[in-house]
């Protein structure tokens, strides 16, 4: 089955066809390291983490490059506010980013280049553009001639003539055209700078990714990714620079993930709804955040709310509870016939095929997770129907299906914990917020068992209701009565 990926450049889904067979070269725009990362950064990191994991699951070799912008106007401004150097500030927040990523359980990219370590590569491209009359120096700055690239606007779908007609006359008299953008910025007092043929200065933002992607992936590579907010002007300008300098296509496929809102509002510090990754992980297990993010296909908008996170937690707990229950099954009797129906067996035998069909359709994690959740329902139903001495065929089917589900869930970073430990830690965390202890719950359960043994159904129901009021749900099964906390975080 071919993987079909939505390409922003063409505006349609296309088969993924790596330039080098079975080797995908991927470049993703990383953070500007001046502050703590927020949930939007988490979505970006997790989306491309999922893509890399899935491609490797399919036995593709993946070279994954994600950069750090460690010199920028925002970094300089924040450094001046806090009284530290731009380098020290950038390094601090790169370290914070790595901590966040480790806590989220993301794979490290193969290469994580920093802009400040690739100044010469940027100067080289700028010089190539100047030599081609596609860029010009002006008072220590260097600007890209937008009109020199006829295809400008092909990624964002913007018409350069319309943009120029709507542009105000540039306040910057050093520009020939208001649409021209900076490749190199002349140094200012107190700012970091590097020597160049045009005098001391620092690179513009857009040239950084053109230089780093060319160094590590070549002039033409497979996939360039980022958020939809980067399509224009950042990625549009990258194409103009790179294709102008190299004379060949830049990235063949452009992947852009959707925005994250908070209760249907754009996230912003002024609205007081700015959620950092640290904030979220203080309240939720990282796999809950993953289950939430992957409940929506990566290109679609994603709205963060406590209710949505509770739904994600409920789904994740069901996965872990099922994993735990199946792991406890005995081997079974090889002489007994299977009880699982042919219909359910066929569904379980097709889990991987249906999961791949979903993922091959532009990495549709929402549909892929739906396949796993549906399989869990079948497994739970089949497990409840097992006798005290189950058929070995049924046990083999259930254990094999659960092992496969755990493997596939790992592609989106779920079911990575020991099931018993995950469920126990969750119980302890949830109990810390309500007025009952685990020992008291177990005491109530024993009282209820005694009542049921004496056929005192009224007392049995009364105990269940008492526990429900305290946020405890009982679950009767073949192995006894279990319980879970149903109150929200």
Swiss-Prot record:
Q: Would you tell me the Gene Ontology cellular component terms?
A: cytosol
Q: Where primarily located?
A: cytoplasm
Q: Does the keyword Ligase apply?
A: yes
Q: Which SUPFAM superfamilies match?
A: Anticodon-binding domain of a subclass of class I aminoacyl-tRNA synthetases, Nucleotidylyl transferase
Would you identify the family this protein belongs to, as annotated?
Answer: Belongs to the class-I aminoacyl-tRNA synthetase family.
Report quaternary structure and partners: Monomer.
Recorded protein name is: Cysteine--tRNA ligase
Organism source for this protein? Desulfotalea psychrophila (strain LSv54 / DSM 12343)
The organism's lineage is: Bacteria, Pseudomonadati, Thermodesulfobacteriota, Desulfobulbia, Desulfobulbales
What gene, per UniProt, encodes this protein? cysS
